[in-house]
Amino acid sequence: MIVGGRELVLHQGFVQALLELEKWAGQHDARKGRALVKRIIDFAYDVIAPFPLSFPAYTLPTAPTRPLRRAVLNRQYAVVYEVFETELVFVYAYSTHRNLGLLELPE
């Protein structure tokens, strides 16, 4: 899919993180897990993708040299992504309640 002249790419680490969030949120009710994944994907495609540079640059302690940006959904979940000239790569998604020092971004 192309939005704003950039191809949207879901990195394998992003997909894996979504699966982990779905499992965590759906522990007692699978619908809640699926609904969370849908909200994050909709947020990425409908809010981030059209205006990727409107969210702040973000330095993750475990990846200080990568040109990342982070967008936060409802103060609980964050989407980490990289903006390139022809691509918008969604790298990772996580709960903001996690210890950031423990986050390991996929390459």
Task: Please identify what each model-predicted range represents.
Residues 1-68, 101-107:
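Basic, Lys/Arg-enriched alpha-helical interface segments
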Residues 69-107:
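Enriched for short, Lys/Arg-rich terminal
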